[in-house]
Amino acid sequence: MNDNGKVVSMRPYPSPNSYVRLDEVIYWSQGLRVKGLLARPKVPGDYEGLLYLRGGLQSIGMVRPARIAQFAAQGFVVFAPYYRGNRGGEGKDEFAGEDRFDAVNGVEVLKQFIQKEKVHLFGFSRGGLMVLWTAILRNDIKSIVTWAGVSDATATYWERVDMRRGLKRIVGGNPNKVPERYENRTPLYEVAKINAPVLIIHGTEDQHVDIEHAYQLEKHLKGEGKTVETWFSYGLKHHFPPKLNRMTVQRL
């Protein structure tokens, strides 16, 4: 019996928005109990689903309740997996290794709380890898947004000196030693399997995820004849100023 995406338990979680209900969810993913945060508008409605895929690594870049409540307030049911090994979840964070299935199975969690069979993907930073793999491994995604998203795991290792120690430990070495493990985490070579339109949002002065990740993703998608749109913000870095961030979310 396949229990992937089956909810084990839920508990109320403090919400920063009086119009949005939050619950922490434990669900099955590849035999592991993984945690995530669910945000639902309190006003009843026929909402579409949004899978929010966080950035960072392990405890860095953890899901922020205010962020997913912001999307729920726009009229979505939002589910944000923490990924395995985080916040008491079983397994270990693998930086888009087997933990990509925590995102894939997160779609099944989301579908249990929406009436429309419409699920959209949103990924930030490392979440860019996760949204692309989810769209590659599923055929029921309606749209994809990758914001300041990673598209090349090898490039991330070389660009982020501060992450090298953690990545070597998680992946099992550097790209010179185990190049195939970084290539296997890089979705650029599999984008032919993506069937949903992709929106790429990126600041040209991003020092955490170089703009080249966006350029390469756009190039590979167009090379496969996929529908892709780009919003490049000149002069902006990894995190947009709050007002512009809100305006961008409202445009989505």
What are these language model-derived features?
Residues T154-E190, A196:
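Mobile cap/lid helix-loop segments that gate and shape the active-site cleft of serine hydrolases
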Residues Y215, K222-L252:
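C-terminal catalytic histidine-bearing segment of alpha/beta-hydrolase fold enzymes
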Residues I114-S125:
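Alpha/beta-hydrolase fold nucleophile elbow
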Residues E94-I114:
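Alpha/beta-hydrolase active-site loop
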Residues I194, I200-H202, D206:
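Short beta-strand/loop motif that positions the catalytic acidic residue
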Residues G128-N139:
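Short glycine-enriched nucleophile-adjacent loop
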Residues N2-V43:
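N-terminal cap/lid segment of alpha/beta-hydrolase-fold proteins
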Residues G45-Y47, Y52-G91, T154:
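Short substrate-entry loop that stabilizes the transition state in hydrolases
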